[in-house]
């Protein structure tokens, strides 16, 4: 693996683990309609992994148009900018329209925003599945209605937390496969800093104007 691929091993392992968790529901399949909410590095890598699995009906949801355009490069077939829609009903309709009048069979929630977690249930069909992996840290409580959002829809919900050693081995295969089909994973690394400029790198990361910020020792 080249240096850029090696830089991406750790975040990609997070998504390999999440997708493997999602597969345990039996709902994530070759022909599934999949919504991915959040187009930061985690969401973008999620889309890339789904594409390497052969899943082609993927809608990306985010409020940043530049990141949505990047999502298309990673394999998303449709995008929905939530900034262009007023209220959850209108946003849900946009997601439904992106799947030609259907709700998602499965969804990945890749943000740490409690409101985003509450919203995503609306995007999923009855009997569908959801993998929540956005809350690596405590982002606060999410307000959902268990009757309407979980029970009545019989949603299959799985959580995902980082990765295992086995996921690392699978990640190597994914990175080779992604490169082989032309997915621009290396473009996720928007900025590289030498070790002596680590403070500048951390500042850039906090500004959230890039995607993956790498510190590369000379």
Show where each model-derived region lies.
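Glycine- and other small-residue-rich loops at beta-strand/loop junctions that grip anionic moieties
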Residues: 7, 35-39, 60, 80, ...
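Adenosine-nucleotide cofactor-binding segment
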Residues: 36-39, 51-119
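Glycine-rich phosphate-binding loop and adjacent beta-alpha segment
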Residues: 114-177, 217-218
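C-terminal hydrophobic helical "lid"/dimerization subdomain
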Residues: 118-122, 165-218
